[in-house]
Amino acid sequence: MAEAKTHWLGAVLSLIPLIFLLSEAEAASFQRNQLLQKEPDLRLENVQRFPSPEMIRALEYIEKLRQQAHKEESSPDYNPYQGVSVPLQQKENGDLPESSRDSLSEDEWMKIIAEALRQAENEPQSAPKENKPYTLNSEKNFPMDMPDDYETQQWAERKLKHMRFPPMYEENSRDNPFKRTNEIVEEQYTPQNLATLESVFQELGKLTGPNSQKRERADEEQKLYTDDEDDIYKANNIAYEDVVGGEDWNPVEEKIESQTQEEVRDSKENADKTEQINDEMKRSGQLGLQDEDLRKESKDQLSDDVSKVITYLKRLVNAAGSGRSQNGQTGERAIRLFEKPLDPQSIYQLIEISRNLQIPPEDLIDMLKTGEKPVEPEQELEIPVEPEDISEVDLDHPDLFQNKMLSKNGYPKAPGHAVAEALSEGLSVEDILNLLGMESAANPKPPYFPNQYNREKVLSRLPYGPGRSKANQLPKAVWMPDVENRQMAYENLNDKDQELGEYLARMLVKYPEIMNANPAKRVPSQGSTEDDRQDENQIEQALKEHLSQHSSQETDKLASVSKRLPVGTPKSDDTPNRPYLDEDLLVKVLEYLNQEKAEKGREHIAKRAMENM
């Protein structure tokens, strides 16, 4: 019993230090846990220091390595397995079955811990004899600035007896980290290596020598050239500044480039200017052509007017001369003319002639009365006329078909040489001007127009006006779309004009004795003149009554026309044939008007035929 008690007490006493150790370990682990919460980098280290089977096996493995290191003399201060990491050892320990780990009881654990403590107490005694051991975490033993490119050269003397690890882990082994890289390199160089290095450097120097010399020479020449250019540029710049006055001096190349650019710009500008000038010339040429056309048209119109008046006067004079010798023929011709209704266009054309030529009606009548000089008619070219378009009056008088050169506006046009021939036969320019009512420049006669309203009305009704250009006329597309429109424009008259013409025709038919060629009435006597005056007054009164509905201007116009048309014999009986002159002249006027109408019709037909072609 005593032995059992002593044995029990010994066990209790042995457990007391173990309990103290465990309590201290728990306290330390508690502190370590607090530190780990603050510094999470220390967790891996703390996991390895917990009392676990892996840790105990690691301690045993370390002891075995120490024993092997003490026995070997070749490498007393270096452990070749210091580079092995802890996970590798854990892997080796992990290969053990779990049953062997769990099979250890508490008593066995106590024995293992006791042995470890004893070994730890024995270590300080052997520590001065040995160098400091390297722990498993070899990274802490290496300095921070140590490079990782140490050569892993295996020396022949270093042959380990116990190689537990496979060859793949030999790469982790390295030379002594405390040995400098320079020392390792110095050990590798030999005299042979140095000799080869010297020869290599010599060869390299020979190869690179000429190229480097050439480069140096080229660099030197370039520097000299640039220096010379800078000096020249500076000198030229100074001289140029002295001459010009502080302006920058450009090199020759830049000056040439600038000159070429300026020349190109100047050429472009000149080309643009020439184009603009050409355009302006074209425009001005077109305007000039238009002005020339207008001038030509005005001249043509003036020449048409002059030639028309001259030919008209010559025809009247010729007709008057032939009328004296053939009174019977003219009387019969007048009877045949006035038996038919008078064309209303003839009367208005007479008025239009007087207004167009700016000749007062009384002067025109005087010209018709006094045209006594016989003038031979001009022999001009004849234009073929279709017989269907010839009126009865034209057929009765074929001698009137001395067709003139038609003008643009439908009136006979005499060429310039015809005017000279007419003047050479006894007429002068002053005579023609006096006949036309246009005196010399020294004594100008104002043109006759009763009022502006009648002038505008007559000019608006005329097919053309004096001085009217093509630009003012209607275009062909408007007034000549086809044959019918042209014919309507040619034949269309005002309603008032038609009424007036019809009334005059009825009056002439109603009173044929006024213009009747009765020889009994043609005997000059005082009683006949009084009867003629009474008839004239009756006609004027009838006209006024009929035209009372019209405007006063038209009434005055018709009254003036009726007054100026000779009805009876004139007062002056200078010659015995004088009473018959007015009637003959009126017949000539009507014949001329009919001839103009026929010529207009022929011109219209010719134009229509040309357009149809």
UniProtKB/Swiss-Prot annotation:
Propeptide section residues: 28-30
Principal cellular location given in the protein's record: secreted
Residues bearing the modification Sulfotyrosine: 150
Single GO molecular function: cytokine activity
Region (Disordered): 67-105, 119-146, 257-287, 546-580
Transmembrane portions of the chain: none
Matches recorded under Pfam families: Granin (PF01271)
Subcellular location per the Swiss-Prot or TrEMBL entry: Secreted
Residue numbers bearing the Phosphoserine modification: 173, 267, 428, 528, 551-552
GO cellular component: extracellular space; secretory granule
UniProt KW Secreted keyword: yes
Keyword Lyase in record: no
Alphabetical UniProt keywords: Calcium, Cleavage on pair of basic residues, Phosphoprotein, Secreted, Signal, Sulfation
GO BP annotations, alphabetical order: angiogenesis; eosinophil chemotaxis; induction of positive chemotaxis; intracellular signal transduction; MAPK cascade; negative regulation of endothelial cell apoptotic process; negative regulation of extrinsic apoptotic signaling pathway; positive chemotaxis
Signal peptide: 1-27
Family matches, as InterPro entries: Chromogranin_CS (IPR018054), Granin (IPR001990), ScgII (IPR038858)
PANTHER family: SECRETOGRANIN II, SECRETOGRANIN-2
Assembly mode: Interacts with Secretogranin III/SCG3.
Family, as annotated: Belongs to the chromogranin/secretogranin protein family.
Name of this chain's protein: Secretogranin-2
Organism annotation: Bos taurus (Bovine)
Gene that produces this protein: SCG2
